[in-house]
């Protein structure tokens, strides 16, 4: 589905289907369209038209440029919302982000983290909540770390207190 020749999908469907983008969750259209969530983002009206179209228009000239950054920054905001945390929680429980390579962490599920909230500073890493270390993901992802930000793991565990703390794991 990563080919632009498949004109039966939206830009969001196409982008989420690209190999390496499995860390991302789908940001609902109503969240994307809410002007409050767009505050501070440049070129939002033009890019919004591209990413929300029901069919990819490869003649738009914007494809896979600014809209990737724009969607990524909206994604970083969304995953801090209640609905976004629920979506990321599902992915975390399924192990979609991988597991910690540290043998003493017993394949602890990890979360994506950015080393910076500034676009273009680093690619996404995985964060182990058990050993508190960041690692390069095993997947082929080249997602920008700003799509998650440096505080996402802390926010995730503070907003989902019903999760068992990794320190309470009986394997320790």
UniProtKB/Swiss-Prot annotation:
<dbReference type="GO" id="GO:0019887">
    <property type="term" value="F:protein kinase regulator activity"/>
</dbReference>
<protein>
    <recommendedName>
        <fullName>Stellate protein CG33238</fullName>
    </recommendedName>
</protein>
<dbReference type="Pfam" id="PF01214">
    <property type="entry name" value="CK_II_beta"/>
</dbReference>
<dbReference type="GO" id="GO:0005634">
    <property type="term" value="C:nucleus"/>
</dbReference>
<comment type="similarity">
    <text>Belongs to the casein kinase 2 subunit beta family.</text>
</comment>
<dbReference type="InterPro" id="IPR016149">
    <property type="entry name" value="Casein_kin_II_reg-sub_N"/>
</dbReference>
<comment type="subunit">
    <text>Interacts in vitro with the casein kinase 2 alpha subunit (CkII-alpha). The relevance of such interaction is however unclear in vivo.</text>
</comment>
<dbReference type="GO" id="GO:0005956">
    <property type="term" value="C:protein kinase CK2 complex"/>
</dbReference>
<comment type="function">
    <text>Unknown. In males lacking the Y chromosome, its strong overexpression leads to the appearance of proteinaceous star-shaped crystals in the primary spermatocytes causing meiotic drive, possibly by interfering with normal casein kinase 2 activity.</text>
</comment>
<dbReference type="InterPro" id="IPR035991">
    <property type="entry name" value="Casein_kinase_II_beta-like"/>
</dbReference>
<dbReference type="GO" id="GO:0005737">
    <property type="term" value="C:cytoplasm"/>
</dbReference>
<dbReference type="InterPro" id="IPR000704">
    <property type="entry name" value="Casein_kinase_II_reg-sub"/>
</dbReference>
């Amino acid at each position: 589905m990563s080919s632009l020749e498949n004109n039966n999908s939206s830009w969001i469907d196409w982008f989420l289907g690209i190999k390496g983008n499995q860390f991302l969750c789908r940001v609902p259209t109503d969240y994307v369209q809410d002007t409050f969530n767009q505050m501070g983002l440049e070129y939002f009206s033009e890019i919004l038209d591209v990413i929300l179209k029901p069919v990819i228009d490869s003649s738009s000239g914007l494809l896979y440029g600014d809209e990737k950054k724009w969607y990524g920054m909206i994604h970083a905001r969304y995953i801090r919302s209640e609905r976004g945390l629920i979506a990321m929680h599902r992915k975390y429980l399924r192990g979609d982000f991988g597991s910690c390579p540290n043998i003493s962490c017993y394949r602890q599920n990890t979360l994506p983290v950015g080393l910076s909230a500034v676009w273009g500073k680093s690619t996404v890493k995985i964060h182990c909540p058990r050993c508190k270390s960041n690692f390069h993901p095993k997947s082929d992802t080249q997602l920008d770390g700003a799509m998650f930000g440096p505080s996402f793991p802390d926010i995730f565990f503070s907003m989902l207190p019903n999760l068992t703390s990794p320190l309470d794991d009986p394997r320790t």
